[in-house]
């Protein structure tokens, strides 16, 4: 359930589940990937604080955040070392295909 709840941005429920023993790295860290894809920065930050791997699945979290135009999440993940060049510059390609100019400008700056 943690992955689904993270993707919905319910931070208090995420915290509760983690406190009850939910594994944040289940399914290759998909909780942080889902939160990133949906733009839930507070959840992303919390999961990072719980040692979620931002680079799992070839940096899928930053790639999905880019493709969905979630600039604040992209900035946060990049500042932590996410690789925007993984998968042949997928983050930039995806942001471009989906018309997210602010994300593109940030990624190429």
Curated annotation (Swiss-Prot):
InterPro entries: Ankyrin_rpt, Ankyrin_rpt-contain_sf
Ranges of the ANK repeats in the UniProt entry: 1-26, 27-56, 57-86, 88-109
Protein's recorded name: Putative ankyrin repeat protein L482
Protein keywords: ANK repeat, Repeat
